[in-house]
Amino acid sequence: MVSSNFYKNLGPRKLTAIIDFLHDIIEPPKIHEDIAIHDIKILQEASPNDISFLSNPKYSEFLKTTKAAACIVPKNFTGEANPNTVLLHTQNSYFAYGKLIDFFYAPIKSYPAKIMKSAIVADSATIGKNCYIGHNVVIEDDVIIGDNSIIEAGSFIGRGVNIGRNARIEQHVSINYTIIGDDVVILAGAKIGQDGFGFSTEKGIHHKIFHIGIVKIGNNVEIGANTTIDRGSLQDTIIKDLCRIDNLVQIGHGVKIGKGSIIIAQTGIAGSSTIGKYCTLGGQVGIAGHLNIGDGAQVAAQGGVAQNIEAGKIVGGSPAVPIMDWHRQSIIMKQLLTSNSKLKK
């Protein structure tokens, strides 16, 4: 159940209004009685006043018994459902669900256009219109922050950093040596623009290499909580538009990540590697340094990548191999273990 402590329910909404809002309902059903929908709930918990959704077929059995007044389903869904539940077929039911959340809910917490008294803002910093600068934020010299941006409590914005419009920087984020585009979200605890892990070894001593690159983050990027992005040693670290980076990701110095790529939690990318456009790296993936991952490539969770990956390829395992080879290896290993167990008996 959604907590009213944190989110405001904007309902009820008429079912016809929901259909109009979603736009992409395929052959909208005729509504004989315009039902008032009060909330969004999962199939198992929905009441006759709620709407639900189905995006994963493993939950389709619950459509038979759900009490939901209506349910968003994929366009090709032909399974059984409660006859009292109105089915709304959409091109992308999960995307429609996300839109419905915005239609039904808003956060209670608001951010007035204000600089809190405890914030420290340098005289040479430029703060745009309608910005919120939270408690104990530090903004150093020559920083530029675009209009309608939010910098939450305890964050540090280092000298010369440029943040675009409509940014949301959550609590205790530190940003140095970085240029950020518009509509960027950075979740709590992220660290961006610090030195990378660069040392030269001479006579048994590891000497720090001064990093003179920066971090460049494009438009409409989200960076997860406690993720770290190092600035480049000589070439810049670059995150292109539309990327989604999960929590606890490590991005090394000089890494370049192409437009629209998705990187899942606990992934580490070593320095100077390039990730192409619209790539997907599963959880706990490791990418060695100085590699090239082609556009649209995918790496399954816990994959260890030590060689370049061609565009569009799907790999898994450690060391990573083509995904079907990895599946075969897993089956053979299981068969060997079973055979060995039988021999011992």
From Swiss-Prot:
It comes from the Bacteria. It catalyses: a UDP-3-O-[(3R)-3-hydroxyacyl]-alpha-D-glucosamine + a (3R)-hydroxyacyl-[ACP] = a UDP-2-N,3-O-bis[(3R)-3-hydroxyacyl]-alpha-D-glucosamine + holo-[ACP] + H(+). One of its GO terms (molecular function) is N-acyltransferase activity. GO terms for cellular component: membrane. GO terms for biological process: lipid A biosynthetic process. Pfam families: Hexapep, LpxD. InterPro entries: Hexapep, Hexapep_transf_CS, LpxD, Trimer_LpxA-like_sf, UDP_GlcNAc_AcTrfase_non-rep. Pathway: Bacterial outer membrane biogenesis; LPS lipid A biosynthesis. The active site is at residue 253. Its EC number is 2.3.1.191. Keywords: Acyltransferase, Lipid A biosynthesis, Lipid biosynthesis, Lipid metabolism, Repeat, Transferase. PROSITE patterns: HEXAPEP_TRANSFERASES (PS00101). Homotrimer. Catalyzes the N-acylation of UDP-3-O-acylglucosamine using 3-hydroxyacyl-ACP as the acyl donor. Is involved in the biosynthesis of lipid A, a phosphorylated glycolipid that anchors the lipopolysaccharide to the outer membrane of the cell. PANTHER family: UDP-3-O-ACYLGLUCOSAMINE N-ACYLTRANSFERASE, UDP-3-O-ACYLGLUCOSAMINE N-ACYLTRANSFERASE 1, MITOCHONDRIAL-RELATED. NCBIfam families: lipid_A_lpxD, PRK00892.1. Belongs to the transferase hexapeptide repeat family. LpxD subfamily. This is UDP-3-O-acylglucosamine N-acyltransferase. It comes from Rickettsia massiliae (strain Mtu5).
